[in-house]
Regions:
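Alpha-helix-loop-beta-strand connector modules within alpha/beta enzyme cores
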Residues: 30-52, 100-117, 146, 150, ...
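Catalytic alpha/beta core domains of metabolic enzymes, predominantly
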Residues: 92-102, 133-284
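Active-site mouth loops of central-metabolism enzymes
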Residues: 1-8, 26, 48-57, 132-145, ...
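Hydrophobic faces of well-ordered beta-strands that scaffold small-molecule active sites
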Residues: 1, 19-23, 48-54, 71-73, ...
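Glycine-rich tight-turn/loop motif centered on a GG-T
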Residues: 44-45, 68-105, 132-143
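N-terminal active-site wall of soluble small-molecule enzyme domains
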Residues: 25-67, 299-301, 319-320
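Glycine-rich, proline-tolerant flexible connector loops at the mouths of alpha/beta enzymes
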Residues: 5, 14-41, 75-97, 163-172, ...
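Active-site beta-loop-alpha junctions enriched in small/polar residues
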Residues: 26-28, 53-59, 74-78, 123-129, ...
């Protein structure tokens, strides 16, 4: 454990604009050291909340709840064993007993959080669903949602409301669909917990930024999401400007005149299909999708005033081009 390094990294994140800092908390020693990190930051005038990220060991979450403002737990490995890709079979009674095991371990943790005024994040990951969930639901958005809902129902029954939810995947299509499905399921059961958005393993550089913008941006445009994290394989402070740009873009759309909506009867919000369009030469209809590049302003006059042929590349074949 390097307390000083953690404090310095947290300061860089906060100075870049981070509104809270998440720290990986592998074991009990690391959880107890959150106290020292908190003291180190507060002594230098930083009062930004700390979030402990806990996997595999519920005891670590119990300790972390005493020193962090929020604790993230992963339903895929909080009580259920880590993922081994075993196919498990349960009777209805046996499955209900597995849920009771979760209740028996989770409720004492909630009580510790109540005593210490600690919030929790129920953070589901597509890549770490338990064997129990995988065996019952498969590797599906429905399984991810149910993994989260099992814990939310316990929170509701125990009148614990200081909860944030995240439900992430590295595949942006899966991530967007799953969050939308989760919101729908919460509405069915009268729940309205805040959402934390993010794309796992987005990568670095331009690719990581584009991937995060696609997943997070689509949901923000839906009006979903309360906090976000752009996960880049770079220094953590590099994530903040990207997140800020996404939020600022959405905020520019605030305050516009109300536009009454009209439901499209053929449109499935959770599983949108390709829209039917009229073909204009080789675009639309049953033609393959084409990619049209945005032209830099400095070159647009040159291109339009010349006799250059404009090409549009078809996505499917790398070396295939068509002229329009």
């Amino acid at each position: 454990m390097d307390t000083e390094a953690c404090v310095e990294q947290a300061k860089r994140i906060i100075d870049a604009g981070g509104e809270y800092v998440r720290l990986t908390t592998q074991g009990v020693r690391e959880a107890e050291n959150l106290k020292n990190i908190n003291i180190g930051l507060r002594s230098q005038g930083y009062d930004t909340p700390l979030v402990a990220d806990v996997h595999f060991n519920p005891k670590v979450a119990d300790v972390a709840a005493q020193y962090a403002e929020k604790v993230r737990i992963n339903p895929g490995n909080y009580v259920d064993p880590g993922r081994t890709f075993r196919k498990l079979e349960y009777t209805d009674e046996e499955y209900a007993q597995e849920i009771e095991k979760i209740r028996a371990r989770f409720i004492p943790f909630l009580n510790i959080c109540k005593e210490n005024h600690t919030a929790i994040r129920i953070g589901v990951n597509h890549g770490s669903l338990s064997d129990r969930i995988m065996s019952h639901y498969g590797d599906t958005p429905e399984g991810m949602v149910e993994s989260c809902m099992e814990f939310l129902r316990i929170c509701v029954a125990e009148h614990f409301n200081d909860v944030v939810i995240s439900i992430k995947a590295s595949n942006t299509v899966v991530m967007v669909r799953t969050v939308r499905l989760l919101v729908k399921e919460m509405e069915k059961e009268g729940m309205a917990f805040p959402l934390h958005l993010g794309v796992t393993e987005a990568g670095d550089g331009e690719d990581g930024r584009i991937k995060s913008a696609l997943g997070i941006g689509a949901l923000l445009a839906d009006g979903l999401g309360d906090t976000i994290r752009v996960s880049l394989s770079e220094a953590p402070e590099n994530e903040i400007p990207v997140a800020r740009k996404l939020v600022d873009y959405i905020l520019t759309r605030e305050g516009h005149p109300f536009i009454p909506g009209k439901e499209a009867p053929q449109f499935n919000y959770l599983s949108p299909g390709r829209r039917k369009t009229k073909a204009v030469r080789n675009i639309g209809g049953d033609n393959l999708p084409v990619v049209i590049a945005d032209v830099w302003k400095g070159l647009s006059k040159l291109i339009l005033s010349s006799n250059l042929t404009i090409f549009i590349a078809v996505e499917v074949c790398p070396n295939h081009e068509i002229t329009i």
